[in-house]
Amino acid sequence: MKFTALLIALGFSLQAGQNAAPSSHLVFDDNFPGDILINEVRVPKAGEAMYTYYETLGWRGRAAGYAGIQAHPKAHNYIFSIWDHKGHTAPIRAVHRGPGTLTEKFGGEGTGLKSWNFTLGWEVDTWYTLVSRCWVMGDHTYYGFWSRSGKTGHWTHLVTMDVAAKEAFFEGGTDAFIEDWLETGKNARTSHLRGGWKRQLNGQWYAFGRAQYSVNYWDLDPGKRSFNFKTNWNGGVAKDATGEYYFMIAGGKATQPTTKNPSQHAIKRTATKPGYAPIKIKSAKVKRDGETLVVEWENDPATLPQFSYKIFYDGIKPRVASGMVPSARRVELPIKQLGRATVHLICEDILGNKSKMYTLNLAGGR
């Protein structure tokens, strides 16, 4: 009996660790540095599986990282992470956390800073646009992360991180992947991707027109994490009423490949730049608070999120105030002589579009 039990135990141990859905990747054709990354992701209802990371944006460089959505036991969440690098002069820190966003250090496969958001949520069968932009702040580089729901059309600023390295831009090629982190390969998980863009450092936009699909072949051998689902994967290009998109399927016994590992795929792109509605200032107001001028404003959430602002004070002593602060909606200007004046506000969005000038009048004696 003891010998039989030992054989059973050994058999179980040999099978354990071989039941993960194959990790699958799409690597796009951007082999140059840039400062903005965009990709759209959709998880069809049949492709939703718990313990899955549907990574949508991944990049290399001195601030390598990734972003995407997850089917997590707590909720459908968003994740944005940046790895530590030997060239960093200080730890990565969060300088802005959107509502519901949490940040924490991570370890394991390298170290760095991770952000989670379990409150915003995402739904199956809905396209979500994920955007990350990096910009130089002195000797550091900031990284912002935004999401847009295809259902509501609204944008959300989830997090901004400060990386202590100058000009640490996004290096290509940008990638997306599917990861089953708890060996639930019996469940098929599917990712749809489209509308990928990268802005080059000269300001020109590059559309992701080609991608290489691959599966981690080293995980398919006997004893490896995906051996029991070594033939249950697929990827390529598909089309529905919304147009063409890249797809990846990992896991599920019914899943069978219709392409090679690796294989090349393409979607013809005709647009020359992203087509999202540019930023619009919804409302603004100005008031006098002692010897301080206070300007507050609100942007339309259905238009591209704010990246920076510029305020022109046309009074007795004209002044200009500006900042690359995506979360700023209030600015205070110390002005001793506050007479009758005009205030002009312009915002620039995360893709570089400028809003129409919003003009406010400040009456004398207020």
Which ranges hold each PLM region?
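Activation corresponds to long, low-complexity, non-globular regions
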Residues: G17-G34, E40-M50, E183-W297, L304
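Secretory/extracellular carbohydrate-interaction modules
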Residues: G17-L102, N117
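Short, aromatic/His-centered strand-loop micro-motif at the edge of beta-sheets
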Residues: F106-W127
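Carbohydrate-binding surfaces in secreted/extracellular proteins
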Residues: W122-H157
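Solvent-exposed loop/turn segments flanking beta-strands in beta-repeat/beta-sandwich domains
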Residues: D300-F312
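Recognizes extended acidic, P/S/T-rich segments that occur
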Residues: K310-Q337
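Beta-strand-rich modules
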Residues: I335-K354
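Extracellular fibronectin type III
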Residues: L351-G365
